[in-house]
C-alpha cells in the first residue's frame, strides 16, 4: 500500500510541470518579454520652503536648494529661492554624500511642526544638477 501511494505521489509531481507548460511559461528562444520594473511616470512635485512652512505636521515634502550652514550636530539651514528653513538630517541619512553650500541638493522628508518652529525631518538627501 505504501509503494502504491509513493508511485501515485511521484506521478502527480511529474505531471504538474507538464500541465503548467500548457498554460503558459517559456515556449522558445523568441518568447522573451520586456519587463521593466518600478514606477514609470512623473516624479512628485518639488515644494518651496515658503509653502512647506504652511503645510500640516507630518506632511511629506520634496525640497530643492542648498544647505548653507550647520547649526548643530544634526541641524542645518536649507535655502531655496523662496526662503530658508531648518532641516534635521541624521548621520545615517547622508549615505556617504558630501555636500558643500555650492551644491544643489534634493531632500525628501516630513514637516515637523512644534508650537513655535517648523523644520524638515529629512529621510533622504541626494545631489542634483542645478
Swiss-Prot record:
Pfam families: BOF. Residues 1-20 form the signal peptide. Residues 25-44 are annotated as: Disordered. Disulfide bonds: none annotated. Residues 29-44 have a biased composition (Polar residues). It comes from the Bacteria. Keywords: Periplasm, Signal. One of its GO terms (cellular component) is outer membrane-bounded periplasmic space. It is found in: Periplasm. One of its GO terms (biological process) is cellular response to hydrogen peroxide. Its main location: periplasm. NCBIfam families: stress_OB_fold, YgiW/YdeI family stress tolerance OB fold protein. To H.influenzae HI_1709. This is Protein YgiW. The lineage of its organism: Bacteria, Pseudomonadati, Pseudomonadota, Gammaproteobacteria, Enterobacterales.
Amino acid at each position: 500500500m505504501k509503494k502504491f501511494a509513493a508511485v501515485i505521489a511521484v506521478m502527480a509531481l511529474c505531471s504538474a510541470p507538464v500541465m503548467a507548460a500548457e498554460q503558459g511559461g517559456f515556449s522558445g528562444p523568441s518568447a522573451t518579454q520586456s519587463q521593466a520594473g518600478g514606477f514609470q511616470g512623473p516624479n512628485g512635485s518639488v515644494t518651496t520652503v515658503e509653502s512647506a512652512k504652511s503645510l500640516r505636521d507630518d506632511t511629506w515634502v520634496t525640497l530643492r536648494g542648498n544647505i548653507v550652514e550647520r547649526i548643530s550636530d544634526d541641524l542645518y539651514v536649507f535655502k531655496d529661492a523662496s526662503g530658508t528653513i531648518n532641516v534635521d538630517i541624521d548621520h545615517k541619512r547622508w549615505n556617504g554624500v558630501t555636500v558643500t553650500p555650492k551644491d544643489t541638493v534634493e531632500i525628501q522628508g516630513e514637516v515637523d511642526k512644534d508650537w513655535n518652529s517648523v523644520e524638515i525631518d529629512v529621510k533622504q538627501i541626494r545631489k542634483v544638477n542645478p
